[in-house]
Structure formats: structure tokens, C-alpha cells
Amino acid sequence: NLIQFSELIQCANKGKRATYYYMDYGCYCGKGGSGTPVDDLDRCCKTHDDCYGQAEKKGCFPFLTLYNFICFPGGPTCDRGTTCQRFVCDCDIQAAFCFARSPYNNKNYNINISKRCK
């Protein structure tokens, strides 16, 4: 669920960067994705896309799955749930922590995908 993913991102980065900055970044952060990731942050998004692909192969619906998590001072943790809920939550938490530790390059926000993502 994108709302929960947004909350996880804010928990992991302690509110340092608004979630919308990640929605149109590089070749993979946002809808779809193709080509070679432009940097570490974009690689986080590709890994997240791949994780959602694995969730779908397991019969889960990652964009619709609601899950439980707790935001601790050290970052988010998945709480109880079904196999699909735990899998999708783990995908989102891994991405949120990856975003938090990866540098953000303003030059890779809202790039020309047709030119840079081949």
C-alpha cells in the first residue's frame, strides 16, 4: 500500500526528506522502470520493484496489501500478519532503509527517462 510505504519512508529517514521526492527520481523511482539505475538511490527503487515482482509471483498483490508495522526510534519493523503482508512489508522496509542511507542527487529528480534510462 503506497500510503503505508510513505509512512515507512518517513519513519526510516526520520522525516528528513518528503516522500514525493522519491516518486519521480532516476529510472526506477516512481511508476514503472527501465534501463540502468542512475545511482544508489535509484538502485534501491529497482530492488523494490524486483521485490514486488517476487511478491506477485507468490500470489500477493503488493500495491493493495495492507500490513502492520511499528515505527521505533531506530526505524520501522514489520508486525504480525499473513505471509503476503509480511513479504510486502519487508520489501517496503528494505527500500525505506535503503532510501535513508543513499545520497539524494537533485540532478536525478524528474529526469528525461527516454534519454537517460536505456
UniProtKB/Swiss-Prot annotation:
Catalytic reaction(s) noted: a 1,2-diacyl-sn-glycero-3-phosphocholine + H2O = a 1-acyl-sn-glycero-3-phosphocholine + a fatty acid + H(+)
Gene Ontology annotations of biological process type: arachidonate secretion; lipid catabolic process; phospholipid metabolic process
A GO term, aspect molecular function: calcium-dependent phospholipase A2 activity
Cofactor binding note: Binds 1 Ca(2+) ion.
Subcellular location: Secreted
Residues at which Ca(2+) binds: 28, 30, 32, 49
Catalytic residues in the record: 48, 92
EC numbers on record: 3.1.1.4
Entries under InterPro entries matching the protein: PLipase_A2, PLipase_A2_Asp_AS, PLipase_A2_dom, PLipase_A2_dom_sf, PLipase_A2_His_AS
Top-level EC class: hydrolase
Domain of life where this protein originates: Eukaryota
Keywords carried by this UniProt record: Calcium, Disulfide bond, Hydrolase, Lipid degradation, Lipid metabolism, Metal-binding, Neurotoxin, Presynaptic neurotoxin, Secreted, Toxin
SUPFAM superfamilies (UniProt xref): Phospholipase A2, PLA2 (SSF48619)
Tissue specificity as recorded in UniProt: Expressed by the venom gland.
GO cellular component: extracellular region
SS bond list: 11-71, 27-117, 29-45, 44-98, 51-91, 60-84, 78-89
Obligatory cofactor(s): Ca(2+)
SMART domains given in the database record: PA2c
Function: Snake venom phospholipase A2 (PLA2) that inhibits neuromuscular transmission by blocking acetylcholine release from the nerve termini. PLA2 catalyzes the calcium-dependent hydrolysis of the 2-acyl groups in 3-sn-phosphoglycerides.
Family to which the UniProt record says this protein belongs: Belongs to the phospholipase A2 family. Group I subfamily. D49 sub-subfamily.
Protein name (record): Basic phospholipase A2 2
Species per Swiss-Prot/TrEMBL record: Laticauda colubrina
